[in-house]
Regions:
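Active-site-proximal, Lys/Arg-enriched surface segment
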Residues: 71-153, 158
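Short, charged/polar micro-motifs that form catalytic or ligand-binding hotspots
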Residues: 26, 41-45, 58, 120-121, ...
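An internal, acidic/charged active-site-proximal segment
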Residues: 160-231
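Basic, low-complexity segments
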Residues: 1-27
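Gly-rich Lys/Arg/Thr-decorated short loops/hinges at beta-loop-alpha junctions or inter-strand turns
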Residues: 63-67, 156-167
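Electropositive nucleic-acid engagement tracts
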Residues: 27, 31-109, 219-221, 229
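Short, contiguous clusters of charged residues that form electrostatic/catalytic patches at enzyme active sites
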Residues: 38, 129-132, 178-185
């Protein structure tokens, strides 16, 4: 790896700190704000594994491991508020919108939504979580603008499992295409404009998804499966 001189490193850390400070009031307590900043730092550090223990061990000025773990697993804060704030920081509001699944390899049974399903990160069926994500493409750059965890139907209908992981009663099964359309509507309401919506065949083959985009007055460029019948 190329060496980074101390002056450049300090400048990057200063810019990162200023960026993270812009989200401070999304969290109600000081310990949450500190843990949030350090969790982001952990995602950027050089630990090969992004487990809590690996990230915590490389933090420059760490909170306790228990505090960092509690922030992710039990601390009450709303991801939607963080996403709203992130969208306000973007320097562009117009471009192409790319919708896709994001596969997160994950073992075990106690992470919400984990099961054997197609994982793009591995290119095969594997134990993972899947999120529906929307990315704005503009000026040769990509900007994440929405993301929501897909909770499979089996999870939503298993009361014991829901209780064990604290899945809120408001979470009900929604197909991925419905999550994607909800994200598009949210982004339009937030003032974004799209030259077109892009998606792979998992979305493009679904007629209900395409019709929803048409009703919103949006152009789209989507892949379809070779066995799709049109008339």
């Amino acid at each position: 790896m190329p060496r980074v001189d101390p002056t450049s490193a300090r400048a990057v850390l200063h810019r990162f700190g200023a960026f993270a400070d812009g989200f401070a009031d999304c969290f109600g307590r000081t310990v949450q704000r500190t843990a949030a900043s350090q969790y982001i730092e952990g995602l950027f550090n050089d630990s090969e594994r992004k487990s809590m223990q690996a990230m915590h061990g490389r933090l420059s000025d760490p909170v306790t491991y228990q505090a960092l773990q509690h922030f992710i697993t039990h601390s009450p804060w709303r991801a939607s508020v963080v996403w709203d704030r992130l969208r306000t920081t973007l320097p562009v509001r117009e471009g192409l919108l790319a919708i896709d699944d994001t596969g997160l390899p994950k073992q075990g049974r106690h992470s919400v939504g984990v099961q054997r399903q197609y994982c793009g990160a591995k290119g095969k069926i594997a134990s993972c979580q899947v999120a529906v994500s929307s990315v704005l493409i503009a000026a040769d750059l990509t900007w994440p603008v929405a993301c929501e965890l897909y909770v499979p139907q089996g999870w939503c209908e298993d009361d014991a499992r829901r209780t064990a992981v604290g899945l809120p009663p408001s979470v009900r099964f929604r197909e991925k295409w419905r999550i994607a359309v909800a994200q598009v509507r949210l982004l339009l309401k937030a003032g974004f404009t799209f030259r077109a919506v892009l998606a792979d065949a998992d979305y493009g083959t679904n007629g209900a998804f395409r019709r929803a985009l048409e009703r919103l007055g949006l152009r789209y460029g989507v892949a379809i499966r070779g066995n799709l019948q049109l008339w």
